[in-house]
Amino acid sequence: MTTPVPPVVAYEPSLGRDARQGSWAELSRGTFRTAIEKVHAAEWEAAARLVEVSVLEAEELRDVYDRWPTATLQWVRDHGATEVAVEEAVRRLGDLIGEPAMAGIAAEWPEYIAAAAAAARLCRDQDPAAAESIEAARRVWQGIHDRAVDRVAGMIDIAVRLVGESALGALWDHLMGDWYDVHERRYALTNQPWEQSAHQLMVAIVDGFHAHLAGTGRQGDIELIEEPHRTGFRFAPCGSGGRSLDPAITDGQPRSGAPFGFAVTTQPHDWAWNTVGICSYCVHCCQLNEVMPIDRLGHPTRVIDPPTWGPEATTTSCTWWVYHDPADVPDSVYRRVGRDPALRPSPSRETAHG
């Protein structure tokens, strides 16, 4: 009797859809890379399922990268910018990032759907060209993703230019209000045990950064770090904010440098870890994972060591930590976002890492 092979894709309740399955070490490897490995192992259906799940991993990005640019420009107008100034700023951005990026992710999304479907079909046909087709789909998605990130980051830069750096935290609060409410309801200690929340947060990390195509090879690879009281996920760099700072994956043109000049913080702010040189796009990670959950739940849900831009030294890697007990989060994490460590919940040792 043969031992059943564990599925590589199955329904994930916390995401409400299918997602990758496996050990954390397996999940730290990019989805496209893993699909190609399955082709080489003649696990054709597994390869096809992985290609198909890459579309689901990318879907949330398709949604927000479609919505955020328009919402940002409206917010800029609502905060006093003239239409002439907005139009001039948008025209400048278009000159920098090009018409395909300015047209938006929705216009390009069908191309990726078609590429992924073609790759999955070749896998099921057991075609020797399947591996090449999977890589072709990855390249299609990388181009679409990166152009969409340029558009979002460029719109955020417009907000900084026309409304001011000090308003950046409020802008991200506006853009992510729906996420905040879901985050608060789900991860409250009164809603479910932290062990369950920690697992869900980790699932969301690997799922999301596969889609961001983290890493210099842009495969979505993540470095897994296991420590006694926390688990870390390092992106070197992530494919969104970290890419804005990294010359190695932007053909020598990081978006925070010339000619783009996308904004980084020039003053300390609670919503940017009170650190100068934080990419304006990366601010949303501080708000969503640290500032907002501390304010609403009493503890961060994920603790981030962010990338930073500097004239002499730039750090492009980013590490997200999930603590096995939120009571173990250090005082310094609270203080660097201007919060009181007294908000921290009491230790709950029964919520051991699962």
Predicted regions and their residues:
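N-terminal accessory segment detector
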Residues: 2-283, 288, 294-317, 324-354
